[in-house]
């Protein structure tokens, strides 16, 4: 019965409540071809003639259907009403069905989410809210700060007047305690909705005018003026030219692609093709012309060159069609955030992860949190979750101090629109801070705020100093109870809400975004999956407490540098034509505190400004681990809406035949049968959730229970969380109480929650590699999602990078080990996901991302070859003719031309490009090499490698003191050895040439060039070994002496100074020989 009712929703006009009716061809009338929002013919005609001319739901301009009179602004081809949308957007009936299931699963009697039955009743009563984020449609339960035994700031639900009144503040020095597993006992329920009667009045007025009368304000009606044409605009309507221009602007796209100009990209592509041809000819020459007296060296070099060619192809061709993108924040504001109206922007949950406060200073994390709380976004749409995977009381106390300082910092940022909104970096700027500031009070307020921040730093640093010495009995909280996280490997889950709608106001009486501390449960014997497990715990907690439609994840040292960063992302995610197919929006990583020359290529500009822009022209950039805004639906393992193919050229010329109902059903069945072509790419469709229920209706409790069990098997044993996954536009159940939500939040971060579920395999951050970001993005792309690369003029986020050589190499080692783990796993892009929706060149990029550490082996051999050639007097290339030399010269010219043209279209400087080339060699013969062997040990022998968190401590000993600090690590051994070998080889080669005469200098130049190529690439490494005072550390001196001794013995064995002249045997020739 209810299933039939859900199907009938599409037959009822959502404006006036009348039947939708049929079109001229006898089928159901569809006003909007994009979203299918049910509107009857009279309402459609009224909207086109006297209204906004756009769909009330998706804001798409209405096309003229057959039989409709033309109006001003109609396009010449707007007469075909049969054009289908590119995307199968869900209809209102389907959405209603999903939310009914969600509510029934939770309480069997709930009304929440975007329920079209409720919407219909609102229309009947003259109250219509926004279909997505209106407060009456998708309620957002506000969890107050939770203490150890009670809920502070409880909001009674007896009267609507008290719904939003915050009660009780956290004292300045009296820090709250986290909720562990104590059940508070409040009960409250939110109700109410926002709406207006504008649509109802306008539609009623149009109908009365159509009958010959115009309604007046007092309810009476008058006859229309005689002689007025049907197409004239009535003077009584509120439609005017300004509204027309405004509505036209809201229908414009929120972003657009900006292709690279043909004058820059076409020469680049031509050189790539020419380089590929030259490379093939060069390899053919090398293979067919062996060196007879140095066959092993020749064979080794040819194998290395073939591998380099393959690696170049995998890296180069995904950059074939790079693009830029532009966003239009003014259009976003016109469509979703008009001044004086409730904001309709989507809610966003922001995740910040930290582990060790000794290596990730609390002050750094505090600056990140403060920049989030001060972001330019509606406060009721932002929630910040801080994951403390180390369960440190220091982090908890520092977060409490941060929440207090935020009450002063946030209003200061918003009052004067300062950038950036991380106080440490704002006050450290060496700029004219009075520029563009017209308020007379700014200087005074800025001075006072700087003083407040210095006091805040003193308090936080005092906490850090106190935490250096851990008491024998463990840390004690202010109420005398032991800190639950004293044992970091065995502690319960903890949640504390510091800020929010009932957690106190700022100094100007405004609400602050929600700030939540989360530490997931840890017990011995359970696999916790490091950062990926912590992120999945945050996904579940946020779904239970706030359920924002989108998620932003940041490392604790990456602060928001552009306060409009979330709005930039919403220009893609909330775009009606693009957003539903986007799994995430990735921002480039930018860094502070890097030396001017960027000695170790920390900025990684080539990757962020060239490679990722190239991928954006395909299926989108890879996920790089931070600065990424996710679509929550994509993280839940669902597939994107299916994009239908447009009719072909000949069918459009001949006129496409309209599909009958039978043919439509047939094609639908065909699509369903071919939907899961490859069993290795599991994809879930939102429509699959209703399986077993649609046929029997909601009265069949058994079918509903079976569906709930299947969902709990996938998402875990939490009815509240399962219900939240069905709410496509976010929000939490309206009838849920803070007590029940808190219990569920504690439950979903328990260490055994993920057992026998799809978490980490198909849902959330994917397990199986220390670089969980690559796996997570790859799974989404394999399901058919696309990602977006957003590069605003002002960098969205900035972070810190390890400028010390040893720390930098350890960071690269971790990334490379993750790639090796993926290479030997079932998720390897070489064989995973065929038959899915991953584009061919996108697969190329992922293959390159996983196999690049293997390049370290041929690179190491190729760097040793120059020294061997110089010491033995042999070479890897035979004596070449003038014709053969053309191909060598052509290859070198094509390599340089590719780099130059790449820098030309991307804007990357030659110094950045060269630093990237140098560190490719340094990292390749050190970190990548170790990663290959450690990965093989882990896969074959099960020997796991533990990694320490990269230190993010601030530089307190002077500018770039960390850069010159020498930290010994085994990763330094291979580059040091290769450097010494080549230097010895150069000396030996020159000595041999001096003693052998003029004719030996010709072949020597090729060998010396080869050796200097290696030494020049290792020059930053050599500077790193020398330190600030250009004094080589003792350990390096010892290694140099040891290696020099080895090669001295080798030198004596070869003895290049001995004259090697062969002649006749004197015993055979005699004295007259």
UniProtKB/Swiss-Prot annotation:
Family designation: Belongs to the glycosyltransferase 2 family. Plant cellulose synthase subfamily.
Coiled coil stretches, renumbered: 443-470
Function text: Probable catalytic subunit of cellulose synthase terminal complexes ('rosettes'), required for beta-1,4-glucan microfibril crystallization, a major mechanism of the cell wall formation.
InterPro entries per the UniProt record, alphabetical: Cellulose_synth, CES_Znf_RING, Nucleotide-diphossugar_trans, Znf_RING/FYVE/PHD
Taxonomy, superkingdom: Eukaryota
Biased composition range(s): Acidic residues: 74-85
Native species: Oryza sativa subsp. japonica
Residues the record lists as binding UDP-alpha-D-glucose: 353, 359-360, 389, 530
Zinc finger map (RING-type): 13-59
Transmembrane annotation, as ranges: 271-291, 294-314, 857-877, 883-903, 919-939, 970-990, 1002-1022, 1032-1052
Cytoplasmic side of membrane: 1-270, 315-856, 904-918, 991-1001, 1053-1073
Protein name in the entry: Probable cellulose synthase A catalytic subunit 2 [UDP-forming]
Enzyme class: transferase
Catalysed conversion reaction: [(1->4)-beta-D-glucosyl](n) + UDP-alpha-D-glucose = [(1->4)-beta-D-glucosyl](n+1) + UDP + H(+)
GO biological process, one term: cellulose biosynthetic process
EC number: 2.4.1.12
């Amino acid at each position: 019965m209810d299933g039939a009712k859900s199907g009938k929703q599409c037959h009822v006009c959502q404006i006036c409540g009348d039947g939708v009716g049929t079109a001229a061809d006898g089928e159901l009338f569809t006003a909007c071809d994009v979203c299918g929002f049910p509107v009857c013919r009279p309402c459609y005609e009224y909207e086109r003639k006297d209204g906004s001319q756009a769909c009330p739901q998706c804001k798409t301009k209405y096309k003229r259907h057959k039989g409709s009179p033309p109006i001003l602004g109609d396009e010449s081809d707007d007469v075909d009403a049969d054009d289908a949308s590119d995307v199968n957007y869900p209809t209102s009936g389907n959405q209603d069905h999903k939310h009914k299931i969600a509510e029934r699963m939770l309480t069997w009697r709930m009304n929440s989410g975007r329920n079209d039955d409720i919407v219909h009743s609102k229309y009947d009563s003259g109250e219509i809210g926004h279909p997505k984020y209106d407060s009456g449609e998708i309620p957002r339960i506000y969890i107050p700060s939770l203490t150890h035994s009670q809920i502070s700031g409880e909001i009674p639900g007896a009267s609507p007047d008290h719904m939003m009144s915050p009660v009780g503040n956290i004292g300045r020095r009296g820090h709250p305690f986290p909720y562990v597993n104590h059940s508070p006992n409040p009960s409250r329920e939110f109700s109410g909705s926002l709406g207006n009667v504008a649509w109802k009045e306008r539609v009623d007025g149009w109908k009365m005018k159509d009958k010959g009368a115009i309604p007046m304000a007092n309810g009476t009606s008058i006859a229309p003026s005689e002689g007025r044409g049907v197409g004239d605009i009535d003077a009584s309507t509120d439609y005017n030219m300004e509204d027309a221009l405004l509505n036209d602007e809201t229908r414009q796209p929120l972003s657009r692609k900006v292709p690279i100009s043909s004058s820059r990209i076409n020469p680049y592509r031509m050189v790539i093709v020419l380089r590929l041809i030259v490379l093939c000819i060069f390899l053919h020459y090398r293979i067919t012309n062996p060196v007879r007296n140095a066959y092993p060296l020749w064979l080794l070099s040819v194998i290395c060159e073939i591998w380099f060619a393959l690696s170049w192809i995998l890296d180069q061709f995904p950059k074939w069609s790079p693009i830029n993108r532009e966003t239009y924040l003014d259009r976003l504001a016109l469509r979703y955030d008009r001044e004086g109206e409730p904001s309709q922007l989507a809610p966003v949950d922001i995740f910040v992860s930290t582990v060790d406060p000794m290596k990730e200073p609390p002050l750094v994390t505090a600056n990140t949190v403060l920049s989030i709380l001060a972001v330019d976004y509606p406060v009721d749409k932002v929630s910040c979750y801080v994951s403390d995977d180390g369960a440190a009381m220091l982090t908890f106390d520092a977060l409490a101090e941060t929440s207090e300082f935020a009450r002063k910092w946030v209003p200061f940022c918003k009052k004067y629109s300062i950038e950036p909104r991380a106080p440490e970096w704002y006050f450290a700027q060496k700029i004219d801070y009075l520029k563009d500031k017209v308020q007379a009070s700014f200087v005074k307020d800025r001075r006072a705020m700087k003083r407040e921040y210095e006091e805040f730093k003193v308090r936080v640093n005092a906490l850090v100093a106190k935490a250096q010495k851990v008491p024998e009995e463990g840390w004690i909280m202010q109420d005398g109870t032991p800190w639950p996280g004293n044992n970091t490997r065995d502690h319960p889950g903890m949640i504390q809400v510091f800020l929010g709608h009932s957690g106190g106001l700022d100094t100007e009486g405004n609400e602050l975004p929600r700030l939540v501390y989360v530490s997931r449960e840890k017990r011995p014997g359970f696999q916790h999956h490091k950062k990926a497990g912590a992120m999945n715990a945050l996904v579940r907690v946020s779904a239970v407490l706030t359920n924002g439609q989108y998620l932003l994840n940041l490392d604790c040292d990456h602060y928001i540098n552009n306060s409009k960063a979330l709005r930039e992302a919403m220009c893609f995610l909330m775009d009606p034509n693009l957003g539903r197919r986007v799994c995430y929006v990735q921002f480039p990583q930018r860094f502070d505190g890097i030396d001017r020359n960027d000695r170790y290529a920390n900025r990684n500009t080539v990757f962020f400004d060239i490679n990722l822009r190239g991928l954006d022209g395909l299926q989108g950039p890879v996920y790089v681990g931070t600065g990424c805004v996710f679509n929550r639906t994509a993280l839940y393992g669902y597939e994107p809406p299916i994009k239908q193919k447009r009719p072909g050229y000949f069918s459009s010329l001949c006129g496409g035949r309209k599909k009958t109902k039978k043919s439509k059903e047939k094609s639908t069945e065909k699509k369903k049968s071919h939907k899961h072509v490859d069993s290795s790419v599991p994809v879930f469709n939102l429509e699959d959730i209703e399986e077993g229920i649609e046929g029997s209706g909601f009265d069949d409790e058994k079918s509903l229970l079976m569906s709930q069990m299947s969902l709990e098997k996938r998402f875990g044993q939490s009815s509240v969380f399962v219900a939240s996954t069905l709410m496509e536009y976010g929000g939490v159940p309206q009838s849920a109480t803070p007590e029940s939500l808190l219990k569920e939040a504690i439950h979903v971060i328990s260490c055994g929650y993920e057992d026998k579920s799809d978490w980490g395999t198909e849902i959330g951050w994917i397990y199986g590699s220390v670089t969980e970001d690559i796996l997570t993005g790859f799974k989404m792309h394999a399901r058919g999602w696309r990602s977006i690369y957003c590069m605003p003029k002002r960098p969205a986020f900035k972070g810190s990078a390890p400028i010390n050589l040893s720390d930098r190499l350890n960071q690269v080692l971790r990334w490379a080990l993750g790639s090796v783990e993926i290479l030997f796993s079932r998720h390897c892009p070489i064989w995973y996901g065929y038959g899915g929706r991953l584009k061919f060149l996108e697969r190329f990029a992922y293959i390159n991302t996983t196999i690049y550490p293997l390049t370290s082996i041929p690179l190491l051999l190729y760097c040793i070859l120059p020294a061997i050639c110089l010491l033995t007097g042999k070479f890897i290339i035979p004596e070449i003719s003038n014709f053969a030399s053309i191909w060598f010269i052509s290859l070198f010219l094509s390599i340089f031309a590719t780099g130059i043209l790449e820098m030309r279209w991307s804007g990357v400087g030659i110094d950045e490009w060269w630093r990237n080339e140098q560190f490719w060699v340094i990292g390749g013969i050190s970190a990548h090499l170790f990663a290959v062997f450690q990965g093989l040990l882990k896969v074959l022998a099960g020997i796991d490698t533990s990694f320490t968190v990269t230190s993010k401590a601030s530089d307190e000993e002077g500018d770039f003191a960390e850069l010159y600090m020498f930290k010994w690590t085994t990763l330094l051994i291979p580059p040091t050895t290769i450097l010494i070998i080549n230097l010895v080889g150069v000396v030996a080669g020159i000595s041999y040439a001096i003693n052998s005469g003029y004719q030996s200098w010709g072949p020597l130049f090729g060998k010396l060039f080869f050796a200097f190529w290696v030494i020049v690439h290792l020059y930053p490494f050599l500077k790193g070994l020398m330190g600030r005072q250009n004094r080589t550390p003792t350990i390096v001196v010892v290694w140099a002496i040891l290696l020099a001794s080895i090669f001295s013995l080798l030198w004596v064995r070869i003895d290049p100074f001995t004259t090697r002249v062969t002649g006749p045997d004197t015993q055979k020739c005699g004295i007259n020989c």
